[in-house]
């Protein structure tokens, strides 16, 4: 059970996040998230990762990989979106959502860096960019053995695409977010394939 004080602090953090550049307002660039993780010491590079993109089945695939890794006794960190009931669902450690106190502590750890990057960019960091960075930091601090990271939208310029994944997974691709990703399945596939890195295996 979450303590009342933790819930109050969580609501305050959520209020701050919800005032940021919204997820639905797309600005296709990695400049802000790249600057933020660089300032934080690139926590996303401190553990191996599996990066999951595609149109359908990303979250299901993420959960399946998480369960498999847990069976093999790996300490897992999983970042998915969107959430159904609580923002805590987006950041899971060892198969369970991060605690309210852990979420608040992670936000407080990076808050000064958020202000720094906001002051240096044409647009402030978005809601999703901040949550992405929080997941990277929470996983590094736990620490985990492997990170399972789901793309938010697209791939090439999604804020999760500052990883150097061991494995890049592409689930089935269809017509989605055509206004941002392309007008054909081929164009959308090309954008989503942006998570494939030279050093990664591809599934």
Spans of features found by a protein language model:
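ATP-dependent carboxylate-amine ligase catalytic core
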Residues: 9, 30, 35-45, 71-163, ...
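Residue-level signal for inorganic ion chemistry
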Residues: 17, 55, 76, 148, ...
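Inter-motif core of Ras-like GTPase G domains
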Residues: 161-172
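Conserved Switch II/interswitch segment of TRAFAC-class P-loop GTPases
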Residues: 172-180
């Amino acid at each position: 059970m979450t303590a009342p004080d933790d819930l109050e602090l969580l609501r305050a953090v959520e209020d701050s996040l919800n005032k940021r550049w919204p997820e639905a307002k797309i600005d296709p660039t990695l400049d802000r998230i790249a600057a933020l993780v660089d300032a934080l010491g690139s926590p996303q590079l401190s553990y191996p990762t599996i990066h999951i993109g595609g149109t359908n089945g990303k979250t299901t695939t993420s959960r399946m990989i998480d369960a498999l890794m847990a069976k093999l006794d790996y300490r897992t960190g999983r970042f998915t979106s969107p959430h159904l009931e609580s923002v805590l669902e987006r950041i899971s450690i060892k198969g369970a959502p991060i605690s309210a106190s852990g979420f608040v502590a992670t936000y407080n750890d990076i808050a000064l860096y958020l202000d720094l990057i906001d002051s240096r960019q044409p647009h402030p960091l978005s809601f999703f960019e901040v949550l992405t960075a929080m997941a990277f930091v929470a996983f590094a601090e736990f620490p985990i053995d492997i990170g399972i990271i789901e793309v938010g939208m697209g791939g090439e310029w999604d804020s999760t695409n500052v990883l150097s994944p061991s494995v890049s997974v592409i689930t089935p691709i269809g017509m989605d977010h055509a206004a941002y990703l392309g007008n054909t399945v081929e164009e959308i596939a090309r954008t989503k394939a942006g998570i494939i890195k030279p050093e990664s295996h591809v599934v």
